[in-house]
Structure formats: C-alpha cells, structure tokens
Amino acid sequence: VNSLTMIDVISRALNPYTQNDEFMKLAEQPEMRFVISNTTEAGIAFDPACKLEDAPASSYPGKLTQLLYHRFKTFNGDKTKGLIIFPCELIFLNGHKLKETIYQYIELWNLGNEFKTWFEEACGVYATLVDRIVPGFPRKDIAAIKEKLQYDDNLVVQAEVFHLWVIEAPQEVAKEFPADKAGLNVLFVPSEAPYHERKVTLLNGPHTVLSPVAYLSGVNIVRDACQHEVIGKYIHKVMFDELMETLNLPKDELEKFANDVLERFNNPFVDHAVTSIMLNSFPKYETRDLPGLKTYLERKGELPKGLVLGLAAIITYYKGGVRADGAEIVPNDAPEIMNLLKEL
C-alpha cells in the first residue's frame, strides 16, 4: 500500500519562543478542550530553573502549567473550562508522570490551592501509548511526490499504514473524543500497561540499539539493517533471545508480535533513517532497553550481550568523530549527557 493523504485539519502553527503572547491566548478560547503532546522521552521532565514569568518556560510541562494557569485565571476557575490532556511521549504511564510534574510546578510557583483543585477536578491527564513508525520527510522520494501532487509541499511526512493509539481513560472521555468514528485505530482501555510493555520492549527497544550499531557500520536505513547479513542476525538475537525473555506474556503471542514488527521494519515503502531514531538515544535506551537488561540479568545471571553491544554503540556514537566511510558523526542530546559520555 502506497498512498498520499492531504492533512487539512491544521489551521495554524505557533512558535511559543517567538509568539508566546499568541500561544498563551490559546488558553482564552472557551471551546478549547484537548491538549496532545509528543516531546520524546526527554520532554516530560521537571526543570526547577523554570519561572512562571518566563516567556515561555523552557520545559514542556512548564509551558503547559503556564497555559493551564492562564486559563484558570481567564475563566475565574470555571470547572467547565478544564482541559483533557493526552501525552504521547513514550514513557510508561506518561499521563501520571506529566501530572506529577505539573504538581511540582504548582508548588514551585506557589500557584495556590484553588488552582490545584481546579486542575485536579476540572482537567484530565490520561496515559497513552502510540504505535506507528513515522520516518518523517521523504527526501529520496520528494521529487516524485511533488510531481504527483502537482504542487510544492515542504511538510510532507512519511508514515507506515499501521497505527495504534491506546488511551487509558473512561468511556466518558471516549465519547468526547470519538476517533473510532473517523476510522482510526484508537482504543480506550482500563489499562495501557500490557500494550505498552509489549510494544516498547519488542519494537522501540530493538530500534534503539539497532540504530547506532547499523549507523556505525555504515548502514543508514532500518530496512537495510534488517536485511544485512550480520546486523539482521543481531536484531533477531536482541528481539527473540534477549528482550522477549524478559516479558511475561504468552510466547506464541510475543513471537507473532515480534515477527509483525520485523515485517514493519522491512517495509519497502518506508525509508526509516537510523539517525532519526538516534535523537536522544541515551534517555531512549534508559526507558526502552535498560529495564529488559536488568530483568535478563536477574533471570539469567548474565548480561545480554546484544543489549550491551547496543549501549556500547550509543556511547561510541556520542563521542562523535568520523565513520569508516568518512561521514561525520553528529550526535544530538541534552548537553550534560553528551559531555558525560564524551568523557567515558
């Protein structure tokens, strides 16, 4: 399946760093109801250096707290003006984590019990899990795409057909957000835990370690890594012999899911650059692979060699330098993490 779909539901885009006044005015719109975010695993974090008067706060939870507080004041604490918040960051129970971080800002900024109560009673922050491989801008195919469209579009985004969004929320929220009626694979469930553990461990975990191993070997696309004589065996070993051994679900179910993941990795229409996966590799490894490494060590009494190799490749990548083919290695992460790893 290879198709083009025009996305026509976005009315505008705002940069809070250059348009903060307009960004804050969003909170003044009475019809505003939903906030959806994806700022990667590194995004939901508390930064005590953020101030209420910052325009804007540097962290995402800080910006969101500013927006919520402005809405609270604008509508004088009207509980019908609360917001429903769906974080999509790949953190287990991301909604709980985001909520905890907002509470930290409420305390840090002394925003008061009235606002805290309004946030607790009028707003909902729900844990979610997203599953879709989205490589981004299709540089290799953009000329053919523009020819087919008959106009220039510099915001083309490539994605696989498969998609799943699991939201841990009550049915009242599902009624307000009836995505299924739009033909979308969105599930409202009592717990996202089983979906999260399986997906993060057997899709994102392999992604995170295969990418630096492949890149340092001169392989730039996930599909090519899977089909590589050596790296392909490495990916299979990490998935089936290491990570799968750390899960408590039926083995036949896990094997089917893992084989489906490999089929998605091999998608001939999706050129998923490993460098796009390696953004913020260290926090990704911490959430996607380190739990499996620890569980494997506890159960087997030895370290999983494939996951350790992946970590070594990440550290090597963060040190920068030049690949064997002459390509410059340019890592991207928080400065404190990059400086630490360069010193190893």
Spans of features found by a protein language model:
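Substrate/ligand-engaging "lid" and interaction regions
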Residues: 1-344
